[in-house]
Each structure stands twice: as C-alpha cells, then as structure tokens.
Amino acid sequence: MNAKVWVLGDAVVDLLPESEGRLLQCPGGAPANVAVGVARLGGNSGFIGAVGGDPFGRYMRHTLQQEQVDVSHMYLDDQHRTSTVVVDLDDQGERTFTFMVRPSADLFLVEEDLPQFAAGQWLHVCSIALSAEPSRSTTFAAMESIRSAGGRVSFDPNIRPDLWQDQALLLACLDRALHMANVVKLSEEELVFISSSNDLAYGIASVTERYQPELLLVTRGKAGVLAAFQQKFTHFNARPVASVDTTGAGDAFVAGLLASLAANGMPTDMTALEPTLTLAQTCGALATTAKGAMTALPYQRDLNRQF
C-alpha cells in the first residue's frame, strides 16, 4: 500500500539571508515542501496549485518535477505572479516572513483545476489557500470531494496573520477546515490561538471535542510533540539536533507523517502510532540542520542512517 498524497496550495520562492546582505533563492512554500518531502521518502505525491507564468513559476514547476512530484495539476498562470517570500532568521534560527507578492497566482486556483480523487488517497492543505477567493472555495471543494471519494484530509493551519485583514474570517475558515480534517497538525501557538487558552491540555481537549479529528498533533519544537488519538493523550520527546534553520521543520514533520500514513494506513492504537511519529520527528529534526526549507528535506537514505 502506498496511497497517493495530494498537496494543495502555494509553491513559493523563498529568499533567505546570506552573507553581506545577499539573498539566497530557495524553492519553498509549505504545500510544495510537503509534496517534495513525501516524494523524497519514497511516497507517491502530487501537487495541486498555480504559479505565475514567470521565471520563478517555471523554476518551481521544474523543481517539483525533478523531485518526482506529479505536477499534472500544477498550472502556470500568465496573468499573475509566483508567490515570493523574504525569510529573516534570528540568532536561534527562528524565522519571520515578508510576502512580496499579493495576490499571487496560487490564490486563483479554481475547481476545474482539481483532479479526480479516489478512495484511500490523502489531501493535505494549509490556511494560506483559504485566505482569498477563488482559492478558498476551491480548497473547501477539494476537501469535500476527497472525503466523498473515501479519502482523508490532513490540515496544518500554518497561520500567517499578516495575510488576513479580517480575523473573524480567519477564525471562520479555520473552524470549517478543522471540521473537515481527519488529521490536524498544530503548532503550540496555533493551539493557543484556536482554543483561546494558554493551557495546552485544555486546548487539546477543546479542539478534540469540537472537531473530533482522528488524530491531533501539537508540535512544540525542542519540547517534542503532543498527540491526541483514540481518546488518549500522550507526549513524544524531540530528537536533539544542532539547528541551523527551522524554516522547513514543520513541513518535513508533516511529510514524514503523511508518507508513513499513506504507506501503512491509520494506526490501530497509540502504540502503533509511535513509529509514525518517530519518523515524522526525525524528518523535522533533520530539516533544521541545513539552510532552506525544501533543500533541507531529508531523503529516505538520510533516515536509514538514523535507524
């Protein structure tokens, strides 16, 4: 079993700080990173989205194609530009983002661009695709379509507040997406935002009760991962590494998670979930040991050295 993992959203050119004020061009965008991450782990991934019919867009499509991602539903839009983001790193390798193109081509995806989903497949989405029309309606349609076909939805909000002028709309979109997701991955900050509580145990209980995902994961960086699964709650320790750049850590974690779930199916209990989370955490940790998001995503051979 190696079910297809579709990833819908933005493919972005990240501009990362280099020496003497120079910027390094790197392929990125959380959905594109996840699609590549799954493919590098031997999974079957496809990207659904639009990039500009410009040099950056052609570069991103070529990059994903070279990484063995199915790009048959990755479109070049001559009317709009590819999303471009300046990433700023602090001394600890933590980052902030400045979006240079708005609205970018990815936000103009329409329902006619969607593939025919099939039973057993996965669809992974983030909230940037929900931040504007027509992408918002297209994303919700994709989530409904794959669930109707017998597939599952994975949702990582990956909230970027500066892309939302209306916080009430952000909350409404998050609420709708969370109701449709089988697997939810949140950062600690996102859990606090969604649950309106700094108490993580309360926040997890609140989210699981309201949305009832099959699996809820809360990533806490060096503090590990909290998991709520089959009415049980547990903590998994992080793998200690020397971090250089955290840009792609969350995406690598999701890629490892989805690659394992697509290959092995949903675990039957918390004990069976442990190898999947170990793989996901190892992917996330390895991705912080090099600069860039996509460039740092691990290959299967990198994992083989870890186990």
UniProtKB/Swiss-Prot annotation:
PROSITE patterns given for it?
Answer: PFKB_KINASES_1, PFKB_KINASES_2
The entry's family comment says: Belongs to the carbohydrate kinase PfkB family.
What protein name is recorded for this chain? Fructokinase
Species in which this protein is naturally found: Salmonella typhimurium
Question: Keywords for this entry?
Answer: ATP-binding, Carbohydrate metabolism, Kinase, Nucleotide-binding, Plasmid, Transferase
Single GO MF annotation: ATP binding
Q: Which GO terms describe its biological process?
A: fructose metabolic process
Checking InterPro entries in the record gives:
Carboh/pur_kinase_PfkB_CS, PfkB_Carbo_kinase, PfkB_dom, Ribo/fructo_kinase, Ribokinase-like
What EC identifiers does the entry list? 2.7.1.4
Gene encoding it? scrK
| Reaction(s) catalysed by this chain's protein | D-fructose + ATP = D-fructose 6-phosphate + ADP + H(+)
